[in-house]
């Protein structure tokens, strides 16, 4: 019984603390770090002092989509902007939006847009 009470108290206190995490706070942190190749849900969880599972739940609840889809959309948007408005190489753009593996970036870009980065650039 004591173990169950302790478990419930931990859960409730954790949830109460985490209610203080807002969508704006999440967006601010994601916007500041999405281009880092090491950026992950665990980084967010560590920053907000919550578990990865809870951060995943909270992210989806607050942002309306899962972490990886949200970050990919940011990276894709920035990549398109750089392709259309700069003369940066595709390799440099890949790195600038958080992809160390350019092949992976090109493949994912084509899956998302139906064209390669070079085709978008024209």
What are these regions (language model features)?
Residues 2:
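Catalytic-core segments of nucleotide cyclases and related cyclic-nucleotide turnover enzymes
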Residues 6-18, 27-39, 58-63, 80-89, ...:
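Basic, amphipathic alpha-helical hairpins
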Residues 22:
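N-terminal pre-P-loop "Q-motif" helix
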Residues 28, 61-100, 122:
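Terminal helix-turn-helix DNA-binding modules in bacterial transcription factors
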Residues 42-71, 94-116:
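Basic/polar phosphate-binding segments, predominantly the helix-turn-helix DNA-binding elements
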Residues 119:
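C-terminal interaction modules of eukaryotic adaptor/scaffold proteins
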